């Protein structure tokens, strides 16, 4: 058989006398190859088996396939005489140091043949007495052994063969062969016994002659630099058995290409009877991929083994250090323990000697004292000294003389410390011990530890006294800031609020009263301060008595609606204000000044009598000096009359009762006097102190008498004011005029208001641009008790705000900013409390499903807007409510339309109109604008719209009853109940209620009603019919059917 790499030499020759081999099966496996220092490598092993078909014709004995191990044995042209008997590796001498090469893996997987001069042949053992070698077991060869190395340049062989006795080198321990990329090596016969080797050497006698001059044969290719590696340190040799080494030598001697086992010559090719073929491209690629994968795996295994070895070395070094440290600590502890025992023993001996009165005990020699404690690892701590107590005792008794009767006087000499011994540390830190470099830990005594524990225990049980702090509280403060000022936890403050029924967060704002309660509850003192210090000296400064002069009285006319208040004022002023009022009712508060018959001026304030204008009446009562209570003689005391009495009592002003409309035939003044007694108003005619007068506004009866009573009451009050000071007053009404801007009706109470003064009213300030009196005339100044319209405010102040004149704009700006900030904080505090209180939380849950009617309200004056908002809020119920999106003074603008469009609200204008641009935008967006000049109409329309949002009331109308006699199952219709109408009638489409055993099991509608086979509209009592219900089939005999209609009834507020 022959094999060639050239395509032209692919020839097959078959000899009849040779055996024909089949395809060799291959078995693959993996073995772990170990190396010194804990390194290992995974090697892939392929096991190739040969199965002979016929007996051999070459005379060789039957051989079994035995793969050889991976290490390649060294070959230096062994003679055939030495091949059967392999020398014992243990008896062979090692390679000289000159031929040793470090055990470094070659850079490339190719083997080089060592030159003969670099490998001197040492003396080999006698071939006659080879050691008995056991039969080598088949060992899987690694893949490195199956790959032949790449061809190398031929190495010149020795000129003459070496004799068998001296040329056989000692077989060193094989080293791992490098991985190479060549075709696998054929299986070699395993050396089984010396007898078989001898027969093989006889058969191949002349083969060594041909093996010499052919260095490129299989044996020469496999002869790598193994002698150099074999000469390395023994720790790097793999632990293999003698049988494996013999097998390796046998493979190199007989199995290599061109070797002795091949034939007489490497160049001569004789037919062997085995058919070979060249490898295909797919097989070459597969083998190349397998070899590349093996190299990659080998590289990964090498890196992994290196990392594991490094980690193992570090771990072993760390363990060694830990063991050494533990042994050192144990030795030091033993030395210290022995030292203490020795010191204790000496102290006891010294104490016994003193008690017995004998001689001092001789000091132990240093060697004896240190002998039990001297160790190789702890020599320094072995030097022990007496304990501190014994040393002090010896020092005290050194100079003491013991005199006993019958005993010579002696001076007790304490034992001298051993030379080089160091005194034991007494737990005290000195400069010597601190700088001596001793590493002994300075321990604390048990007594010191107990004292520390008692001290700590005493601090724990000590009752800390609570500190009382002075807490400065502003008008509003957050919970966090309050807790910080009290040095308390915020959680404790929140707990106190929860006890009071308020759910609050630590960032919520609370008012000063709540903060004061919390601070006092926690044991602190409170000092209330406010930012209102900026307003000090602004109002209520005391005037000098000499500067006071009489001023006109301010009279407020109050009473029920339609009792003639404005008519009475018109009769006094000789004017006709009633004719210009919408609906004949007063909806604004008016201020006028007239001259009495005696020449003294009197200021009148006309208030609305409608129930919606309660706030106006309250403001009028606050700024007035006298209240004129107008009561119609034909109508009696009404609710607003009683309310006016209450306002006057709250303001503390006197009341003059004016019984109006006495000219009517049904007038009953005496009934008015008796009815006022129910409200604790007792007139003079009934023995009281309240002045009364019967008047008629239309007939102008007793008007002068009324004015005289007003002058008398003012004289009794002794009304005075200082006109030569900064003006103070009250805003009675405020509005936003299109041409004049913000306009405020101010009643000057003290001082004199002049044009150009800097005034502050509420959250707005400005320069007085103009002063207009009640007759429309422009005035340069206004004295006490004079009502004027003031122009020049930066915005519309609210009705009821106090007005004062300040010196500079900076002061005015500071005051207004403080008031604005205060208003925001108070609103936030109210909102936070509203969110947190339990009652408001329940109210929010109750109003969760309530429908809302959004509104945008614009009015002519501030008082009218307040009245409209208050009236609409009274219409709210649990089901529907009017939600005021925005309420303001002035005409309807584009911003109002945009706000209404975003909220889906209706715009209501009270005595105002919309601008042209606002009307165009409202038409474009589809926003409804409604105008009103009478508050009755506005309230009625809103009430009707809110009533439409209420769910209607459902009322049932019973029609009749029927009883099911039988249930029929119709294929296309379903189940149909055959019924008899017991009373009333049954209508198709009506509501039905199915009752079974007095329990309602279904409510629905009657979908089908038939009389025989005809569809009918209704069936009266006593007749039978068929019924079918919508989406219900579970009908049973003897069920009762109630038929009824449902009517919806609209609701109203």
From Swiss-Prot:
Q: Which UniProt keywords apply?
A: Cytoplasm, GTP-binding, Initiation factor, Nucleotide-binding, Protein biosynthesis
Q: Where is the composition biased (Basic and acidic residues)?
A: 279-288, 295-353
Span list, region G3: 606-609
Summarize where GTP binds, as residue positions: 559-566, 606-610, 660-663
Q: What does this protein do?
A: One of the essential components for the initiation of protein synthesis. Protects formylmethionyl-tRNA from spontaneous hydrolysis and promotes its binding to the 30S ribosomal subunits. Also involved in the hydrolysis of GTP during the formation of the 70S ribosomal complex.
Family label: Belongs to the TRAFAC class translation factor GTPase superfamily. Classic translation factor GTPase family. IF-2 subfamily.
* UniProt cross-references to PANTHER family, sorted A to Z: TR-TYPE G DOMAIN-CONTAINING PROTEIN, TRANSLATION INITIATION FACTOR IF-2-RELATED
Name of the protein in its database record = Translation initiation factor IF-2
């Amino acid at each position: 058989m022959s094999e060639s790499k050239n395509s032209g030499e692919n020839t097959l020759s078959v000899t009849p006398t040779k055996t024909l081999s089949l395809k060799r099966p291959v078995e693959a496996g993996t073995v772990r190859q170990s190396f010194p220092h804990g390194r290992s490598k995974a090697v892939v092993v392929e096991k190739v088996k040969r199965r002979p078909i016929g007996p051999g014709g070459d005379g060789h004995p039957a051989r079994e396939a035995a793969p050889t191990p991976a290490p390649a044995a060294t070959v230096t042209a062994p003679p055939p005489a030495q091949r059967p008997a392999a020398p014992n590796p243990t008896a062979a001498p090692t390679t000289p140091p000159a031929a040793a090469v470090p055990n470094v893996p070659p850079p490339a997987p190719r083997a080089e043949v060592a030159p003969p001069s670099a490998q001197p042949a040492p003396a080999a053992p006698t071939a006659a007495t080879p050691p008995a070698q056991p039969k080598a077991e088949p060992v899987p060869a690694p893949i490195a052994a199956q790959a032949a190395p790449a061809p190398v340049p031929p190495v010149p062989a020795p000129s003459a063969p070496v004799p068998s006795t001296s040329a056989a080198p000692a077989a060193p321990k094989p080293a791992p062969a490098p991985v190479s990329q060549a075709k696998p090596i054929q299986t070699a016969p395993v050396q089984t016994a010396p007898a078989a080797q001898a027969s093989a050497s006889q058969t191949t006698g002349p083969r060594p002659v041909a093996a010499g001059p052919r260095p490129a044969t299989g044996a020469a290719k496999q002869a790598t630099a193994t002698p150099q590696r074999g000469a390395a340190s023994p720790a790097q040799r793999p632990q293999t058995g003698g049988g494996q080494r013999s097998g390796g030598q046998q493979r190199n001697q007989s199995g290599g290409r061109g070797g002795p086992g091949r034939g007489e010559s490497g160049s001569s090719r004789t037919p062997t009877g085995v058919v070979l073929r060249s490898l295909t491209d797919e097989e070459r690629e597969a083998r190349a991929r397998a070899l590349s994968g093996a190299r990659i795996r080998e590289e990964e295994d090498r890196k992994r083994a290196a990392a594991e070895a490094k980690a193992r070395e570090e771990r072993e070094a760390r363990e060694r250090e830990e063991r050494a440290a533990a042994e050192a600590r144990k030795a030091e502890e033993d030395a210290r323990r022995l030292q203490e025992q020795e010191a204790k023993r000496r102290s006891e001996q010294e104490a016994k000697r003193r008690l017995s009165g004998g001689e001092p005990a001789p000091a132990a020699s240093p060697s004896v004292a240190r002998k039990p404690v001297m160790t190789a690892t702890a020599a320094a701590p072995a030097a022990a000294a007496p304990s501190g107590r014994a040393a002090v005792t010896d020092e005290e008794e050194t100079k003491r003389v013991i005199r006993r009767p019958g005993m010579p006087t002696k001076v007790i000499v304490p034992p001298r410390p051993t030379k080089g011994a160091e005194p034991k540390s007494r737990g005290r830190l000195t400069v010597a011990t601190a700088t001596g470099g001793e590493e002994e830990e300075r321990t604390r005594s048990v007594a010191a530890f107990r004292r520390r524990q008692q001290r700590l225990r005493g601090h724990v049980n000590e009752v800390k006294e609570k500190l009382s702090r002075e807490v400065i509280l502003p008008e509003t403060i957050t919970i966090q800031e309050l807790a910080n000022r009290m040095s308390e936890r915020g959680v404790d403050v929140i707990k106190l609020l929860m006890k009071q029924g308020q759910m609050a967060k630590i960032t919520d704002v609370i008012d000063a009263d709540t903060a004061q309660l919390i601070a006092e509850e926690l044991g602190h003192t409170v000092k209330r301060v406010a930012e209102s210090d900026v307003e000090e000296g602004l109002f209520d400064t005391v005037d000098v008595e000499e500067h006071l002069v009489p001023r006109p009285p301010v009279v407020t006319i109050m009473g029920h609606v339609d009792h003639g208040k404005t008519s009475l004022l018109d009769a006094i002023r000789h004017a006709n204000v009633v004719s210009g009022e919408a609906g004949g009712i007063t909806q604004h508060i008016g201020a006028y000044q007239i001259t009495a018959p005696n020449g003294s001026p009197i200021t009148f304030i006309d208030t609305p009598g409608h129930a919606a204008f309660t706030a106006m009446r309250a403001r009028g009562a606050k700024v007035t000096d006298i209240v004129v209570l107008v009561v119609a003689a034909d109508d009696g005391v009404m609710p607003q009359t009683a309310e006016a009495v209450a306002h006057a009592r709250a303001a503390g002003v006197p009341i003059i009762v004016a019984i109006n409309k006495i000219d009517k035939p049904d007038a009953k003044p005496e009934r008015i006097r008796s009815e006022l007694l129910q409200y604790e108003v007792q007139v003079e005619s009934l023995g009281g102190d309240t002045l009364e007068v019967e008047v008629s506004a239309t007939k102008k009866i007793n008007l002068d008498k009324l004015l005289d009573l007003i002058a008398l009451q003012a004289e009794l009050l002794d009304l005075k004011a200082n006109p030569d000071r900064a003006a103070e007053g009250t805003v009675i009404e405020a509005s936003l005029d299109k041409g004049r801007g913000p306009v405020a009706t101010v009643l000057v109470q003290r001082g004199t208001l002049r044009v150009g003064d800097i005034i502050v009213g509420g959250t707005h300030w400005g320069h007085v641009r103009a002063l207009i009196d009640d007759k429309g005339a422009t005035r340069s100044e206004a004295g006490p008790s004079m009502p004027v319209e003031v122009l020049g405010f930066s915005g519309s102040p609210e009705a009821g705000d106090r007005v004062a004149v300040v010196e500079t704009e900076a002061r005015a700006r500071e005051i207004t900013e403080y008031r604005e900030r205060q208003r925001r904080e108070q609103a936030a505090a109210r909102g936070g409390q509203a969110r947190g209180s339990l009652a408001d939380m329940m109210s929010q849950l109750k109003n969760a499903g309530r429908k809302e009617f959004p509104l945008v309200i614009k009015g002519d004056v501030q008082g009218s807007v307040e009245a409209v908002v208050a009236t609409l809020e009274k219409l709210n119920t649990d089901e529907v409510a009017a939600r005021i999106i925005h309420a303001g003074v002035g005409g309807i603008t584009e911003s109002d339309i945009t706000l209404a469009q975003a909220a889906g609200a209706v715009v209501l204008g009270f005595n105002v109109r919309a601008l042209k641009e606002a009307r165009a935008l409202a038409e474009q967006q589809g926003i409804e604008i409604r105008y009103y000049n009478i508050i009755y109409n506005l309230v009625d329309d809103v009430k009707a719209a809110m009533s439409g949002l209420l769910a209607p009331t459902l009322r049932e109308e019973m029609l009749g009853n029927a009883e099911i006699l039988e249930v029929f199952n119709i294929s296309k219709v379903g189940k149909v109940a055959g019924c008899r109408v017991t009373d009333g009638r049954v209508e198709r489409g009506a509501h039905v209620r199915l009752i079974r055993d007095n329990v309602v099991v279904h409510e629905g509608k009657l979908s089908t009603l038939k009389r025989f086979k005809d569809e009918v509209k209704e069936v009266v009592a006593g007749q039978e019919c068929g019924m079918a219900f919508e989406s219900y089939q579970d009908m049973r005999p003897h069920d009762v059917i109630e038929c009824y209609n449902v009517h919806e009834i609209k609701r109203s507020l």
